[in-house]
Amino acid sequence: MKTRMIFVGPPGAGKGSQAKIISQTLNIPHISTGDMFRTHIKGSTPLGLEAKKYTDQGLLVPDDVTNQMVKDRLSQKDVEKGFIFDGYPRTPDQAIFLDNLLMVTNQKLDVVLNISSSDEVIVKRITGRRTCPVCGAIYHVDNYPPKVAGICDNDGATLVQRKDDQKETIIRRLSVYKEETFPLIKYYAHKNLLMDVDGNQPLEVITKHVLEILEQK
């Protein structure tokens, strides 16, 4: 069973959902860059304070800061049996850093899962999201609606659509993703690590396909 993996894919393709499911199924940590940033920023670590300078301005955190957070995370005991990266690496430079980091500890990546979805499916998925401003619960108008339309099941707050979930923002993010990530996809394809997964399918079908890939020798 492959246990050291990376999930890549455009926003809304479902890579985060799959990473969480596989993490629970295989009992290995799901390492999301967003979670790493939040943990360091909340803990006011030197890396967190450095990252905050950029996130507060809506800028990407520089590679050297992100890479050091990854190095710190991979030094923890819970990654010995495997790990799932979600949102990292973002560029070939980060991928090379990760390769070298794993080499030092006699480890290597098993597979890179590219969850791809059509722009139309992604736009429909994301624009349907609604978030509770109080508890942070996420719903979807079609796929996971609240019991009462527009109202959070947990606290009765009125659900909102985040700016990030609006159509214009999504189209812009998809364009940036394609431009930024194509070199990374090419890098892993060249190393024969890339496996494509059709993200247009239902969640459970995607999970089944992912598990089949992980079980291949």
Curated annotation (Swiss-Prot):
Gene3D superfamilies found in the cross-reference section: P-loop containing nucleotide triphosphate hydrolases
NMP: annotated segments: 32-61
Main location: cytoplasm
Catalytic reaction annotation: AMP + ATP = 2 ADP
Pathway(s) it belongs to: Purine metabolism; AMP biosynthesis via salvage pathway; AMP from ADP: step 1/1
Protein name, entry field: Adenylate kinase
Signal peptide extent: none
